[in-house]
Amino acid sequence: MNNFINIRDISVKDLKKILFDAKKRKAKRKKLNYLEPDKDIPLKGRFLIQMFEKSSTRTRLSFYLAIRQLGGGALNLRKDELHFGEGGESIHDTAKILSNYGDIFMLRTDSDKKLLELLRLIMVSQDLLQKM
């Protein structure tokens, strides 16, 4: 799976696998500190770029801890740090720059149009897609 935009786009089989894997992973974490990475560190060396047009403490922290627990790193970008077609930098340019530095992307926005445009423009590393 290379994106998770709408739950209706995921097959029942894939959704069951996601939930089963999450339950199994959560059970293995019982003895670990919440900042300690999972033993298999599946996202070691991977980088999540979180983009927030709408602030959310709970979303930001849950994604940050999840990526840490899976062995990766994260960067948070606030609305004032993003240039989606504003200030002389096009959304295409922004997506290209983000693609150079990130492996995984998360956008919290009110705009389905902006989300779908970013999805179309952002390039995700093919070796990461093959592992998932």
Briefly describe each language-model feature range:
Residues 1-61, 65:
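Positively charged, low-complexity intrinsically disordered leader regions
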Residues 3, 73, 125-128:
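Conserved beta-strand segments of alpha/beta enzyme cores
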Residues 6-9, 82-85, 106:
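Short N-terminal micro-motifs specific to bacterial/archaeal maturation
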Residues 40-41, 70, 89-90, 120-121:
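Charge-rich, low-complexity amphipathic helices
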